[in-house]
Protein backbone atom coordinates (compact mmCIF):
# COMPACT_ATOMS: atom_id res chain seq x y z
CA UNK A 1 0.00 0.00 0.00
CA UNK A 2 1.31 3.45 -0.87
CA UNK A 3 0.26 6.72 0.69
CA UNK A 4 0.36 9.99 -1.20
CA UNK A 5 0.69 13.18 0.77
CA UNK A 6 -0.36 16.36 -1.00
CA UNK A 7 -0.02 19.95 0.08
CA UNK A 8 -3.32 21.70 0.71
CA UNK A 9 -4.32 25.16 -0.47
CA UNK A 10 -7.53 27.14 -0.11
CA UNK A 11 -8.85 29.12 -3.07
CA UNK A 12 -11.42 31.80 -2.25
CA UNK A 13 -14.23 32.57 -4.66
CA UNK A 14 -15.80 35.96 -5.39
CA UNK A 15 -18.50 35.11 -2.82
CA UNK A 16 -15.86 34.82 -0.09
CA UNK A 17 -16.30 31.05 0.17
CA UNK A 18 -13.00 29.19 0.64
CA UNK A 19 -12.54 25.86 -1.16
CA UNK A 20 -9.84 23.37 -0.09
CA UNK A 21 -7.76 21.84 -2.88
CA UNK A 22 -4.91 19.32 -2.95
CA UNK A 23 -1.83 20.07 -5.05
CA UNK A 24 -0.92 17.31 -7.52
CA UNK A 25 1.68 17.11 -10.27
CA UNK A 26 0.23 17.89 -13.70
CA UNK A 27 -0.80 14.75 -15.54
CA UNK A 28 -1.70 12.86 -12.34
CA UNK A 29 -4.52 10.35 -12.14
CA UNK A 30 -6.82 10.03 -9.14
CA UNK A 31 -7.81 6.59 -7.86
CA UNK A 32 -11.44 5.89 -8.68
CA UNK A 33 -11.90 8.98 -10.85
CA UNK A 34 -14.24 10.83 -8.49
CA UNK A 35 -16.30 13.87 -9.54
CA UNK A 36 -14.78 17.17 -8.55
CA UNK A 37 -13.35 20.58 -9.27
CA UNK A 38 -9.87 21.41 -10.52
CA UNK A 39 -7.52 24.28 -11.28
CA UNK A 40 -4.54 24.37 -13.61
CA UNK A 41 -2.20 26.82 -11.87
CA UNK A 42 0.91 28.73 -12.85
CA UNK A 43 3.56 29.42 -10.23
CA UNK A 44 5.51 32.57 -11.02
CA UNK A 45 9.19 33.15 -10.29
CA UNK A 46 8.07 35.10 -7.21
CA UNK A 47 6.15 32.06 -5.94
CA UNK A 48 2.75 33.60 -6.67
CA UNK A 49 0.06 31.14 -7.79
CA UNK A 50 -2.34 32.17 -10.54
CA UNK A 51 -5.11 29.98 -11.98
CA UNK A 52 -4.81 29.46 -15.74
CA UNK A 53 -7.99 27.36 -16.05
CA UNK A 54 -10.73 26.39 -13.57
CA UNK A 55 -13.17 23.57 -14.25
CA UNK A 56 -15.41 20.82 -12.93
CA UNK A 57 -15.93 17.26 -14.09
CA UNK A 58 -17.71 13.96 -13.38
CA UNK A 59 -14.28 12.26 -13.36
CA UNK A 60 -11.14 14.04 -12.15
CA UNK A 61 -9.11 11.88 -14.53
CA UNK A 62 -10.88 13.55 -17.48
CA UNK A 63 -10.19 17.22 -16.88
CA UNK A 64 -9.62 18.84 -20.26
CA UNK A 65 -11.54 17.50 -23.23
CA UNK A 66 -10.84 20.38 -25.62
CA UNK A 67 -7.50 20.41 -27.43
CA UNK A 68 -7.68 24.21 -27.69
CA UNK A 69 -8.05 24.56 -23.93
CA UNK A 70 -5.22 22.07 -23.33
CA UNK A 71 -2.99 24.13 -25.63
CA UNK A 72 -4.00 27.30 -23.77
CA UNK A 73 -3.19 25.74 -20.39
CA UNK A 74 0.18 24.48 -21.66
CA UNK A 75 0.96 27.72 -23.49
CA UNK A 76 0.23 29.83 -20.42
CA UNK A 77 2.70 27.93 -18.29
CA UNK A 78 0.54 25.88 -15.93
CA UNK A 79 2.89 24.15 -13.48
CA UNK A 80 0.48 22.62 -10.96
CA UNK A 81 -2.83 20.82 -10.76
CA UNK A 82 -5.12 21.56 -7.80
CA UNK A 83 -7.93 19.03 -7.24
CA UNK A 84 -10.64 18.09 -4.83
CA UNK A 85 -13.41 15.52 -4.98
CA UNK A 86 -16.88 17.04 -4.87
CA UNK A 87 -19.77 14.61 -4.37
CA UNK A 88 -22.43 17.31 -3.87
CA UNK A 89 -23.67 16.95 -7.46
CA UNK A 90 -23.11 18.68 -10.78
CA UNK A 91 -24.90 21.90 -9.80
CA UNK A 92 -22.65 22.36 -6.75
CA UNK A 93 -19.55 21.76 -8.90
CA UNK A 94 -20.76 24.30 -11.49
CA UNK A 95 -21.48 26.90 -8.77
CA UNK A 96 -18.02 26.45 -7.23
CA UNK A 97 -16.41 26.69 -10.67
CA UNK A 98 -18.34 29.90 -11.47
CA UNK A 99 -17.51 31.43 -8.07
CA UNK A 100 -13.78 30.84 -8.55
CA UNK A 101 -13.79 31.99 -12.19
CA UNK A 102 -15.57 35.22 -11.18
CA UNK A 103 -12.82 35.97 -8.63
CA UNK A 104 -9.71 34.86 -10.55
CA UNK A 105 -10.66 35.38 -14.23
CA UNK A 106 -8.31 32.69 -15.61
CA UNK A 107 -7.02 33.39 -19.12
CA UNK A 108 -8.05 30.00 -20.54
CA UNK A 109 -11.60 30.24 -19.17
CA UNK A 110 -11.88 33.59 -20.99
CA UNK A 111 -10.69 31.85 -24.17
CA UNK A 112 -13.27 29.09 -23.69
CA UNK A 113 -16.02 31.72 -23.35
CA UNK A 114 -14.93 33.46 -26.57
CA UNK A 115 -14.93 30.13 -28.44
CA UNK A 116 -18.49 29.48 -27.28
CA UNK A 117 -19.77 32.81 -28.67
Regions found by a protein language model. Give the residues of each.
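Short flexible/disordered coil segments
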Residues: 80, 112-117
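Structural alpha-beta junctions
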Residues: 74-78, 102-110
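Short, surface-exposed loop/turn microsegments at beta-strand edges and helix-strand junctions
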Residues: 29-33, 72-78
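Canonical phosphoinositide-binding patch of PH/PH-like domains
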Residues: 81-88
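Mid-chain, well-packed structural core segment of small domains
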Residues: 62-75, 82
Amino acid sequence: MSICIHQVIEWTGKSGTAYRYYIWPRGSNVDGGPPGNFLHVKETKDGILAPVFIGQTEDLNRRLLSRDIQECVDGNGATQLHLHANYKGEQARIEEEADLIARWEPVCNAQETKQGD
